[in-house]
Every structure is written in structure tokens, then in C-alpha cells.
């Protein structure tokens, strides 16, 4: 390889396969090998890097290093924009992401860490490398595992609906956390979902309760937690393939574990303690803020939205108080508007409606158990008339109706108008005669 160094090792002096005789040739040989490895690791290595451009496909058949330089400054409308480098190959490849070309050179140098990490890296035939909007440069190395492997690399900048959905989920959890913490549907659905996703973690947690304290088995449990998290991540990455090939087993697992989780949730029941409900509410709201921040690609806009959400949530009652105070001040400053007087027809209609309503309420009270019938009958003059009224008869007798019509009905009104007109005409006649009498007296 370019930049390497060849080390010539002289044969050791003395008997033995390692030359451990006179002169210590074995030790010298080991030192020379180690020094050669160090020189090999620290030597300058030239790396052939291919610069990627957006929406341009780069196809290769051998291991290659790539770099992408982001020159665009993010704007406010890029809050849900994601930049990704897609590597799609016909066979399995190993992809390593680094920050710059210097890190690519370090990957080419020999080290124990690079040697072992190469075996731990996942091999995929279709993967995406996320690039930050504020990242100036991102580099990656694609290593082929088998010969005749053809792969393509492309940079994609697009609107990511997943970021938008994560942001909406955060808004819902933050503003509806108090309602969700008291909802039975949310309680059972969340319990079943956690049971299905984290069944291995729950089993390990239950086993840890039966283990004695200060036991070496905790080392195994810690390893089990890590292994469970790795399995969950692996399943989610290959969920589509698992569903296509093993949908019967996956469906059986979901139904079985979901029923068991529902049974456990049903046994303990929803939260009833107010403090527990408050803790769940705060937890949901904190998760909502985290989702809101992770769902927006521009940090300062995400922080601004979080501050606005906090102010909107916590200043709800002060804002209502200020609004009510403002309305009262405005009403006090306005000139009082005189009330509109009712017309004679409106007054008559309103009187009839209110009278009928009051009579119905009186009948309902008399028929209710709260009314003392004997005490009421002892206080009235006509018990039979009262009984007829309670049964639905009119509260007035025909004689009372005729008297009312004579006094306040249409005939009485006409008579009153005639009397008023006669009195007015008499006053006018007396006024017309007064000037003549005054004039005669003046002449005499």
C-alpha cells in the first residue's frame, strides 16, 4: 500500500525456532516487527476520495471513500428537511461514517480497534446515512464483502414526513398529557404496546426481583438488558422482512403478549392516586417536549417553539384573568345605555308567558312529595278549587274572567278612551271661552 514501509529482518543468531540463543535475536525480531507496525500505522496514506453532489448517482464496483460538502445555509422552511446519503448495493456492504478526510486516513491505518470494530459493524445492502443540516462535511467509507458487488451512492435532500409526525406527536403529548393520563384507552393501549415491544426487558426485570443481592448473576442480567436492546433494534430494522417471511409467528407473538399485557393492566387498573396521575402527566409532557425538539432540524427554532408552548400552557389562566379584567374596564369606561322599554303588546305577551310558567311550576310543586297537602288545604278557603287547579283546571272562575275583561279588557279600554276624549273636549271649550270673558271685562 502507498506510504507503507518494508522491514527487512535478519535471521536470528543461535539455535531454536525463535533464535533465543546468543545475542537475543528473538527479542530483536519482535521489536523490529512492532516497530514496523508502528511505522506502518503512522505513515501518511493517500486516500482517493470521491466528492458527492446532490441528486447525482455515483456507481462503483470496488471499495471507495466518499465525502459530501453541505454549502447551503438552513432556512426557516427547512425545519422538516432531511439530508441523507443512500448506499444501495446488489450484495452486502459495510458502511462507515466519519467527519472528514483525516478520519478516513485513520481508517486506512492499522489499529487494534479498527481491526475488531470491522467485525462488529453491520453489513447491509441498502442503508441511509443521515447528514446534519449544519454539518459542513460528512465522509463515509464503503467496503465490499464479496467480489462483483455493484453499489450506488446518492445524496438526497427532501421533506421528511417522519419528522413532521414526531413533532405532531410531541404537541399532542404536551397539550393533552393531562387528559391522556386519565384516559383508560390510553392506559391499556400503552401497556399493551410496552408489553409487546419490551417483553424481553420485562422478563429480565422480573427475574432480577428474585435474584439475591450482591450476586454475580447481575452481570448476566446487565448483559441480558444490552442483548435485549440490540434484539429490539435489529427487529425494527428488519420488521418488513420478518413480517413477509414469518408473519404467522409474529402475529401469534403479538396476540399472546398483547393479551398478557392487557391482563396485567386490567389486574392493577388505571391510576387513581392524584400524585401518580400528576407524575404521569409531567412525564408525558416532558416526552412531548423531547419529541418536539427532535422533530425539528433547526435547534433555535425548536427552542423557540418549545418556549411558546410552555408559555401557552402555563399562562392559560393568567391570560383569561387579564381578558376578563380588560372586559370589565371597557364596560366601566363605556357610557351606560338606557334600557329599551317594552311596548304594550310585548308587555302583555311577556306577562302571559311568565304567568303560565309560574302556574306550571306551582302545579309541579303541589304534586311533589315536598308539598305538605294537609297543611296547604288548612290554609285555603276553597280546597275543591285548589284540587281542580292541581289536576289541571284553570286558576280563574268564569265570573273572575268576565270581571277582568270588563275592567282591563277591550271594552274597558274603549270606555276609558271615550272618557278621556270627553274630558279633553271640555277642557278645550273652557279654554276657548276664557279669552272672550277676559275681553268683555277689559272693555267694561
Curated annotation (Swiss-Prot):
Positions annotated as glycosylated: 125
A: annotated segments: 186-297
Keywords, alphabetical: Erythrocyte maturation, Glycoprotein, Membrane, Nucleus, Phosphoprotein, Signal, Transmembrane, Transmembrane helix
InterPro entries: NEMP_fam (IPR019358)
Keyword RNA-binding belongs to the record: no
Localization terms from the record: Nucleus inner membrane; Nucleus envelope
A Gene Ontology BP annotation from the UniProt entry: erythrocyte enucleation
Record-annotated membrane-spanning stretches: 161-181, 186-206, 216-236, 245-265, 289-309
Post-translational modification, as annotated: Phosphorylation may regulate its interaction with RAN-GTP.
Region forming the signal peptide: 1-43
Its membrane topology: Multi-pass membrane protein
Phosphoserine: modified positions: 368, 424-425
Annotated stretches, region: Required for nuclear localization: 336-444
Self-association and partners: Homooligomer. Interacts with RAN-GTP. Interacts with EMD.
Domain notes from UniProt: The transmembrane domains are required and sufficient for its oligomerization.
Protein's job: Together with EMD, contributes to nuclear envelope stiffness in germ cells. Required for female fertility. Essential for normal erythropoiesis. Required for efficient nuclear envelope opening and enucleation during the late stages of erythroblast maturation.
Family statement drawn from the similarity comment of this UniProt entry: Belongs to the NEMP family.
Name by which UniProt lists this protein: Nuclear envelope integral membrane protein 1
Source organism: Pongo abelii
Lineage of source species: Eukaryota, Metazoa, Chordata, Craniata, Vertebrata
Gene: NEMP1
Amino acid at each position: 500500500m502507498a506510504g507503507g514501509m518494508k522491514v527487512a529482518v535478519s535471521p536470528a543468531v543461535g539455535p531454536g525456532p525463535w533464535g533465543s540463543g546468543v545475542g537475543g535475536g528473538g527479542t530483536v525480531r519482535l521489536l523490529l516487527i512492532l516497530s514496523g507496525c508502528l511505522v506502518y500505522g503512522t505513515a501518511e496514506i493517500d486516500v482517493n476520495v470521491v466528492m458527492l453532489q446532490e441528486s447525482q448517482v455515483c456507481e462503483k464496483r470496488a471499495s471507495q471513500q466518499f465525502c459530501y460538502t453541505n454549502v447551503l445555509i438552513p432556512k426557516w422552511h427547512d425545519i422538516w428537511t432531511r439530508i441523507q446519503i443512500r448506499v444501495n448495493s446488489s450484495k452486502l456492504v459495510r458502511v462507515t461514517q466519519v467527519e472528514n478526510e483525516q478520519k478516513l486516513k485513520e481508517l486506512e491505518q492499522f489499529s487494534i480497534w479498527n481491526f475488531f470494530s470491522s467485525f462488529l459493524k453491520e453489513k447491509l445492502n441498502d442503508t441511509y446515512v443521515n447528514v446534519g443540516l449544519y454539518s459542513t462535511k460528512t465522509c463515509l467509507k464503503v467496503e465490499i464483502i464479496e467480489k462483483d458487488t455493484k453499489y450506488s451512492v446518492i445524496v438526497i435532500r427532501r421533506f421528511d414526513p417522519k419528522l413532521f409526525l414526531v413533532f405532531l406527536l410531541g404537541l399532542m403529548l404536551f397539550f393533552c398529557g393531562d387528559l391522556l393520563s386519565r384516559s383508560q384507552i390510553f392506559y391499556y393501549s400503552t401497556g399493551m404496546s410496552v408489553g409487546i415491544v419490551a417483553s424481553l426487558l420485562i422478563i429480565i426485570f422480573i427475574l432480577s426481583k428474585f435474584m439475591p443481592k450482591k450476586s454475580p448473576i447481575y452481570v448476566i442480567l446487565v448483559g441480558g438488558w444490552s442483548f435485549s436492546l440490540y434484539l429490539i433494534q435489529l427487529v425494527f430494522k428488519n420488521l418488513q422482512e420478518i413480517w413477509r417471511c414469518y408473519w404467522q409467528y409474529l402475529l401469534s407473538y403479538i396476540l399472546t403478549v398483547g393479551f398478557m399485557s392487557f391482563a396485567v393492566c386490567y389486574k392493577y387498573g388505571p391510576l387513581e392516586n392524584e400524585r401518580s396521575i400528576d407524575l404521569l402527566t409531567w412525564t408525558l409532557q416532558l416526552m412531548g417536549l423531547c419529541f418536539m425538539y427532535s422533530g425539528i432540524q433547526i435547534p433555535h427554532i425548536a427552542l423557540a417553539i418549545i418556549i411558546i408552548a410552555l408559555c401557552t400552557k402555563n399562562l392559560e389562566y393568567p391570560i383569561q384573568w387579564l381578558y376578563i379584567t380588560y372586559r370589565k374596564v371597557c364596560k366601566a369606561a363605556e357610557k351606560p345605555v338606557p334600557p329599551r322599554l317594552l311596548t304594550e303588546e310585548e308587555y302583555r305577551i311577556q306577562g302571559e308567558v311568565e304567568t303560565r310558567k309560574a302556574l306550571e311550576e306551582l302545579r309541579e310543586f303541589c304534586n311533589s312529595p315536598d308539598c305538605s297537602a294537609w297543611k296547604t288545604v288548612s290554609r285555603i278557603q276553597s280546597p275543591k278549587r285548589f284540587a281542580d287547579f292541581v289536576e289541571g283546571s284553570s286558576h280563574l272562575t268564569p265570573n273572575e274572567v268576565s270581571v277582568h275583561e270588563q275592567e282591563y279588557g277591550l271594552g274597558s279600554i274603549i270606555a276609558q278612551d271615550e272618557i278621556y276624549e270627553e274630558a279633553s273636549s271640555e277642557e278645550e271649550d273652557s279654554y276657548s271661552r276664557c279669552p272672550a270673558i277676559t275681553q268683555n271685562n277689559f272693555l267694561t
